[in-house]
């Protein structure tokens, strides 16, 4: 492990050198600990035994249009760039909602990088290229002569069908991705496998992309429901969390991986969550009303 940490620290020093060359003026890059880089160099040279603290710093970015500043707070974990970078952008010109949306978009961009890729410089470039729209939205809301339109988001619900979902590692991945992206819904394991995911459109689409790749072939999105909302979408959710749905197998198959799920139980589950109409879409079978 020490070798990988040292390799990571060497890459961090390299990236810090690039940052200081990009921001040569005093105060543009502010280290939380002015001795941080010296301590890391001593550790790499072997004159310091204890692992030095993480590199933490703030970069003040000047955005040209509109004329505003962003303070980018960065923490480099010891194993960065092989683990995720910790960073957050702040500006007094952004309200809480716009600042949240800006950082969510920045985080989504950074997740496209492969482990081992340095990304602080790329994050800076992304902010310089993409942050203006978040400030312009705030500017419109501050102008009394113009009635600002609320920011609209698309709330999406996807119904995903798979021939089967058995493997433990796949089931674990689905749950982890669902909880990380702050979506709600369920994953019904067995044969067939059904996944419902709901939340803001960008989160659902990232979920769909992540679980499909690199090699899940027998899976498709059978149905999608979307609606524009100006709120947080909580009132549109049919589920309160993202959980694994375990129903009885149809017949006594024990632990064999060829059991069919009890679709009658699944239909009752859909009814409880106001989704009975999806049953026919998923299976081509018209559900029988419980009132008939």
Swiss-Prot record:
One Pfam family here: Prp3_C
Gene3D superfamilies cross-referenced by the UniProt entry: Ubiquitin Conjugating Enzyme (3.10.110.10)
Record-annotated membrane-spanning stretches: none
PROSITE patterns reported in the protein's UniProt record: RWD
Record domain RWD: where: 14-134
PANTHER family in the record: RWD DOMAIN CONTAINING PROTEIN 2, RWD DOMAIN-CONTAINING PROTEIN 2A
Protein's recorded name: RWD domain-containing protein 2A
Gene from which this protein is expressed: Rwdd2a
């Amino acid at each position: 492990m020490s070798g990988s940490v040292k390799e990571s620290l060497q890459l961090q020093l390299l990236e810090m050198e690039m940052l200081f060359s990009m921001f040569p003026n005093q105060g543009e890059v502010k280290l939380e600990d002015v001795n941080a880089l010296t301590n890391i160099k001593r550790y790499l040279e072997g004159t310091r035994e204890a692992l030095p603290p993480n590199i933490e710093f703030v970069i003040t970015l000047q955005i040209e249009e509109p004329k505003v500043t962003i303070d980018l707070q960065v923490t480099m974990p010891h194993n960065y760039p092989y683990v995720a970078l910790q960073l957050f952008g702040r500006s007094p010109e952004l309200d809480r909602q716009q600042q949240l949306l800006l950082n969510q978009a920045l985080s989504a961009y950074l997740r496209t990088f492969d482990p081992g890729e340095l990304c602080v410089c790329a994050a800076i470039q992304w902010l310089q290229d993409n942050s203006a729209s978040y400030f312009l939205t705030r500017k419109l809301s501050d102008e009394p002569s113009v009635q600002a339109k609320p920011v609209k988001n698309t709330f999406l619900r996807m119904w995903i069908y798979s021939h089967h979902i058995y493997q433990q590692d796949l089931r674990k991945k689905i749950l982890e991705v669902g909880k990380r992206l702050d979506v709600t819904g369920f994953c019904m394991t067995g044969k067939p496998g059904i996944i419902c995911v709901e939340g803001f459109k960008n989160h659902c689409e990232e979920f769909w992309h992540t679980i499909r790749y690199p090699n899940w072939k027998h899976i498709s999105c059978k149905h999608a429901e979307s609606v524009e909302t100006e709120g947080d979408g909580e009132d549109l959710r049919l589920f309160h969390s993202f959980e694994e749905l375990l129903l009885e197998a149809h017949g006594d198959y024990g632990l064999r991986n060829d059991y069919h799920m009890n679709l009658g139980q699944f239909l009752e589950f859909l009814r409880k969550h106001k989704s009975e109409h999806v049953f026919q879409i998923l299976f081509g079978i018209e559900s029988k009303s419980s009132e008939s």
